[in-house]
Amino acid sequence: MYLRFANRKPYEKLHLSTALEDWDMSEELKLSITADQYFAGADDKVERYTLRRQHSTELSPTRSEEGDFQECKFRPSLWLVVDPNLVIPCPEWINRIPPAPELTSPPLQLQRQLSVEYSTVEDSEDEAPTSCSDLMTDDDNDDSYNPCQPKNKHKRAKCLGKKMRVQKGLTELESWARPPLNYCNLISLALRNSEDGCLNVQQIYSFVRDHFPFFRIAPDGWKNTVRHNLCFSSSFEKSSGWVCADGHRRSCLWKLTRQGRRKFRNEMHALSDDLLHVLRRSMKKPALMELMFGM
């Protein structure tokens, strides 16, 4: 039985103490079920419980050979008050964080102190130089290195330098247009412009990056798409030759199939003038466009 109280302190002292000591245990022991299990409103089942009681008393060890009941010397107490948090502690209760200590200073004064501290930290972070000229000026004026000085200035400079490189890379990415070709056409272009018509995967990567600078800064996910097209497209097949890559690993060579050559030629001739203009802008050497694409 679990009891819930608004104020638990007076009842916490009752842990492991007995209650309801005037309960008639001699009558309780004669029952087949305890009184707390005999729910109210079950008068229709009284006869069945009475039969159980009679049967249990006939087999009771307290019954003597003459048929009279012996007085039971056992006087247990059925009601024991326990604190379940102490008897069976829950992990959440054990690992519960203790309450924070009460604040001695007034809340208004504490809020003012915190606001001053936060404003100081934010102002110190905003003091970092935001332009390249400011960064170069700070580095030029710092002629001597003092190990006693805090390193926040150097960390800011390093972070700003990295941020500027990322912005520069994004600018270069925007300056080069993405070629209006699918990955099968890019692979076919690389294979048909090789010396013997065969390349491994790394050589295909190098060809695409060299002639289309967009893929130099693009995320490396495009490489997975290239490998996927090599394995599952009917335009390519593995060659019988092998090449030793870096680390003396043998890498298989890929070549165009007859269907792949015909598909590439038809799709290139089907490009519109606008797409050809975008394709020329995306190439590092647009003068080689007619030679590379066979136009």
Swiss-Prot record:
Q: CDD domains, alphabetically?
A: FH_FOXR
Q: Where is this region: Disordered?
A: 119-146
Keywords carried by this UniProt record: DNA-binding, Nucleus, Transcription, Transcription regulation
Respond yes or no to whether keyword Transcription is given for this record. Answer: yes
What molecular function does GO assign, one term? DNA-binding transcription factor activity
What is the protein name for this chain?
Forkhead box protein N5
Q: Which Gene Ontology CC terms are recorded? A: nucleus
* Annotated SMART domains: FH
Annotated organism of origin? Xenopus laevis (African clawed frog)
- Where mainly found? nucleus
Task: State the tissue distribution.
Answer: Ubiquitously expressed in early cleavage stage and gastrula stage embryos.
Q: Which Pfam families does the protein's record reference?
A: Forkhead
Could you tell me where this protein is found in the cell?
Nucleus
| DNA-binding region of this protein | 178-275
